[in-house]
Amino acid sequence: MKHIISPLDLSLSELSDVLNLAEKIIVDPKQYSECCQGKKLATLFYEPSTRTRLSFEAAMLNLGGSVLGFSSADSSSAAKGESVADTIRVISSYADICAMRHPKEGAPLVASTYSSIPVINAGDGGHNHPTQTLTDLLTIKNLKGRLDNLTIGFCGDLKFGRTVHSLINAMVRYEGIKFVLISPEELKIPAYLREEVLDRGNIPYEEVKNLEAVMPELDILYMTRVQKERFFNEEDYIRLKDSFILDAKKMEGAKEDMLVLHPLPRVNEIATEIDNDPRAVYFKQAEFGVYARMALIMLLLNVVPQE
């Protein structure tokens, strides 16, 4: 049995399996509509979510399975003090696979040690978000045609942005990748990521504070919001929330085939005037999240149809 707590829990070969299957689903989703008949997905969401929770539910329903779970800690026995370990022990007897989101880093890892069913990390604090990474990789692969030889800019909250941390961990395994890290000083990527992943792996990167200046070199621009829920001091949030805003003027300097990604939700970091630019693919990215999760669920449950 395999748990997906980090993108690194999938080898490059396994990543390829997920992405290739997801692309087949994009072409003909109805072919897989009965793969999970009789199977149940438990969604244990201790933290608010729109896209991740609903796309997991849509994925399982599209596969012919069913879903049970909760959408906030307050609506579960966590509000009474029940531990993650006890919760997952019980849920393991109710479902065949589990997706967990939790505000505490490492909670899904704890759950996996007590679970008798596969656990998928649907986001743990500011740490990891592996299924968003699969969504991002699928979007890039499908729309750019490759996952190597890319210059990728990450802009905004790189300190608390778990989607950024996960995608960096995944992309460093491909050839010819360069990162441009665009953030205010207070929201730079964590030191462990810089030292243990980028520096140790000799991955080329630059840290800058001016988005417009680096736009011409980017193949991918990954925008993020400044996350109010990660700040202890509201004054710091207010001071930093408008640090980087992507608008039509900044897009003038970008390549014609650059892609703008965003894990969503956005607040004001991408002007709505960008939405109709063909390079803005964040809504397509959200759609691809369903297909990526369908593929992962099928592979973890070993229900992929034989060709």
Curated annotation (Swiss-Prot):
Query: What PANTHER family is this protein classified in?
Result: ASPARTATE CARBAMOYLTRANSFERASE, ORNITHINE CARBAMOYLTRANSFERASE, MITOCHONDRIAL
Q: What class of enzyme is it?
A: transferase
Q: Which organism is it from?
A: Lachnoclostridium phytofermentans (strain ATCC 700394 / DSM 18823 / ISDg)
- E.C. number, please? 2.1.3.2
Statement: the UniProt record of this protein carries the keyword Manganese? no
Q: List GO molecular-function terms, semicolon-separated.
A: amino acid binding; aspartate carbamoyltransferase activity
Q: Which HAMAP family match?
A: Asp_carb_tr (MF_00001)
**What is the name attached to this protein's record?**
Aspartate carbamoyltransferase catalytic subunit
Question: What's this chain's function?
Answer: Catalyzes the condensation of carbamoyl phosphate and aspartate to form carbamoyl aspartate and inorganic phosphate, the committed step in the de novo pyrimidine nucleotide biosynthesis pathway.
Which biological process, per GO, is one annotated for this protein? 'de novo' pyrimidine nucleobase biosynthetic process
Family under the similarity heading: Belongs to the aspartate/ornithine carbamoyltransferase superfamily. ATCase family.
Pathway field of the UniProt record reads: Pyrimidine metabolism; UMP biosynthesis via de novo pathway; (S)-dihydroorotate from bicarbonate: step 2/3
Q: Where does L-aspartate bind?
A: 80, 162, 225
> Its quaternary structure?
Heterododecamer (2C3:3R2) of six catalytic PyrB chains organized as two trimers (C3), and six regulatory PyrI chains organized as three dimers (R2).
Q: Which Gene3D superfamilies match?
A: Aspartate/ornithine carbamoyltransferase
Note whether Transferase occurs among the keywords.
yes
| UniProt: carbamoyl phosphate binding residues | 51-52, 101, 129, 132, 264-265
Q: Which domain of life is it from?
A: Bacteria
Q: Catalyses which reaction? A: carbamoyl phosphate + L-aspartate = N-carbamoyl-L-aspartate + phosphate + H(+)
Task: Supply the alphabetized keyword list.
Answer: Pyrimidine biosynthesis, Transferase
The cross-references to NCBIfam families, in alphabetical order and at most eight, read: asp_carb_tr, PRK00856.1
